[in-house]
């Protein structure tokens, strides 16, 4: 399960971790949450949807716990597998802008970037599909403004 969905888990951790060094900590927290929650998985949704939901809520909880301690939160991007430096810089900028969004907005845009359908995003976040569509439109508009500054 973990090996099959590793990419999903790392992507969520990457967006929520305050720095490159913490991504593995977040990943371990998610794996532990998946291990604990697996006996309760009823199979009513796709496994990937369940993994996304657990990963998002675990990372958000981890961020909340860390926010209780005073520290600066900054998204550090490291894409060692990306050879194109210009694309890497653009991706760095995009993730830096995304990191300034609120928790729910980050979750929504991450799922949208993964090309997840609105129904699946709704199932993961607990929002209605209509609300997901409206929020994504507003988030994309906000990102354009933030990115062009």
What are the residue ranges of the model-derived segments?
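Acidic, proline/glycine-rich intrinsically disordered inter-domain spacer in sigma factors
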Residues: 75-99
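Short, charged helix-capping/linker segments at alpha-helix termini
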Residues: 10-29, 40, 124, 129, ...
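Arg/Lys-rich amphipathic alpha helix in sigma70-family domain 2
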Residues: 40-42, 53-73, 87
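Structural recognition of an alpha-helix C-terminal capping motif at a helix-to-coil junction
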Residues: 11, 25-32, 36, 45-57
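A short, charge-rich alpha-helical start-of-domain segment used by transcription regulators
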Residues: 1-11
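Pre-recognition alpha-helix immediately N-terminal to the DNA-recognition helix
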Residues: 8, 93-96, 103-107
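Short amphipathic alpha helix immediately N-terminal
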Residues: 2, 100-120, 149
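DNA-recognition helix of helix-turn-helix
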Residues: 56, 60, 119, 125-149
């Amino acid at each position: 399960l973990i090996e099959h969905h590793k990419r999903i888990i790392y992507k969520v951790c990457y967006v929520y971790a305050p720095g490159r060094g913490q991504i593995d900590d977040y990943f371990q927290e998610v794996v532990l949450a998946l291990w604990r929650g697996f006996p309760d998985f009823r199979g009513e949704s796709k496994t990937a949807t369940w993994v996304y939901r657990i990963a998002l809520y675990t990372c958000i909880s981890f961020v909340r716990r860390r926010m209780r301690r005073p520290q600066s939160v900054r998204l550090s991007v490291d894409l060692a597998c990306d050879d194109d430096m210009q694309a890497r810089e653009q991706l760095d900028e995009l993730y830096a802008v995304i990191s300034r969004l609120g928790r729910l907005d980050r979750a929504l845009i991450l799922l949208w970037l993964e090309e997840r359908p609105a129904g699946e995003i709704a199932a993961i976040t607990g929002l209605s599909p209509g609300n997901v569509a409206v929020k994504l439109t507003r988030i994309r508009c906000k990102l354009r403004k933030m990115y062009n500054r």
